[in-house]
Amino acid sequence: PQFDEFGVGIIITSYNELQFYLSLFNQQLPIESQFIKQLADSLNAEIVSGTVQNVSDATTWLGYTYLFIRMLRNPVLYSIGVDQLEQDPLLQQHRGNLINSAAIVLEKHGLIKYDRRNGNFQATDLGKIASTYYVSNTTMSTYNRYLKPNAGEMELCNIFCLSEEFKNIVVREEDKLEIAKLLERV
């Protein structure tokens, strides 16, 4: 829910798992944010678009997310102590720390330049490529590590197969025979 506190979801599942989802629905358990896993990549996109130019902008931007709402409602789950919440009810410091950590990761992978003294961000060409083509920062790091100017076709295929974006792709049973035939030719 972009600007609201609730949303509508559609669950498509197998009959075997239907009871599990019905029990979740009946208990009215809140759906927790998974945004933290993609924070660095989302921050990179905001930096590239020019929406976020420094830590202060990014901290404000993070305050508009569902993650922020869930951190306020369930602070313990997000490693926020009660005393920390009392001292900083809007979690300004915690959000700043999350942004700082994400910026360090992006800088390490060569996607941004991060001036820690004044908190300014600057997108790099690699960061622009990653944002434009939805390539994760970890995949860009892999490419930086393994891509060489003289890489052959097989080497390029192997490197691209290391992409994080492919990690959840499962080979269908009906495709296994065709893949085995392809492997015989290699």
Question: Residue spans of the language-model regions?
Answer:
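C-terminal accessory/connector segments of nucleic-acid motor ATPases
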Residues: 25, 29-179, 184
